[in-house]
Amino acid sequence: MDYIKQIKKIQKQQIDPVYFLHGTQAFIIEEMINEVLANTLSKDEQDMNVQRFRLADTPLQLIIEEAETLPFFSSKKVVIIQDFYLATSQKNDTSIDHQIESLEPYLKQPLPETVLIIIAPYEKLDERKKVTKQLKTNTTVVHAAELSEHETIKWIGEQANQLGIDVADPVKKRLVELAGTNLLQLRSELTKCQLYSGVGGEVTMEAVNQLVAKTLEQSIFDLIEWSMKGEISAAVANFKEMVRRKEEPLMILAMLVRQLRIYLHVKELKQRSYSEKQMVGMLKLHPYVVKLAAKQVVSFDEKKLKSSIMAAADTDYAIKTGKQEKEFAVELFIIKLGALSTREYA
């Protein structure tokens, strides 16, 4: 896992002059920045020797000039560019004139006293751009992307070691099932578990089930599975619990439809012998989402899935035309999902 290797290098004081962090996983980006700061400057030095810039506010050439300036009463300084959209196809409304050519000579010969961190918190880079190629060639690149299930389990182990708690592999997997793969959320849940078990303690399956709240996505998974299996009482109870948590019924309906469509797509691709890896690329979904869907669709009939999506459209229409109150309408739709599970098709 690329970023964990870089974290370990930084903690050994092996700090590179320029880092290029790109991707949407905010926790990875923040942890990289925090580790660089902690292992480069003392708290007192950080006040005078950490500069943060946004391209939307400051010309790139001025940021490079700052990077080329010696630190103030310190052996090191850190310069951070927060939103490097120049490496993407994203348009920006700013009228600031960026001299992109000022970056190349600096990347080839960075100031030894400066650590430059360039952040592109976007899903995709524009690989055709010269600046993107320069960054990928002349910097230490860390892709802050969603982790696979295996990588997430490994990451939980690293975080558990830092927190001084013991988490067995089955408990790690349960944690991911409940909290999802968002690292910020997982770190928060692990911290909660540490407070419960104490430093040096073991986090049990019972503790995770008791302490960790399901994500909305996981609740949707469970709700559909219970409904399609005819376990209506459990499905309705799940829905009412989501409403008690202040989840908007229309949002729940939208997510139900999204999940049903994912199931339908995965079902069709599975029948055509596509692998889960191929499905991830085609559907642009997280590998963990595809893995769960592939496991669940085994017991789902394709015609029932299509009928369920049509029933959801009818429910949405009834709500938006004022024919049915939204909470009642979504609950009725969940009951209909259960009815579909018992219907036979020729």
Predicted regions mapped to residue ranges:
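Conserved beta/loop motifs at nucleotide-recognition and modification sites
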Residues: 1-346
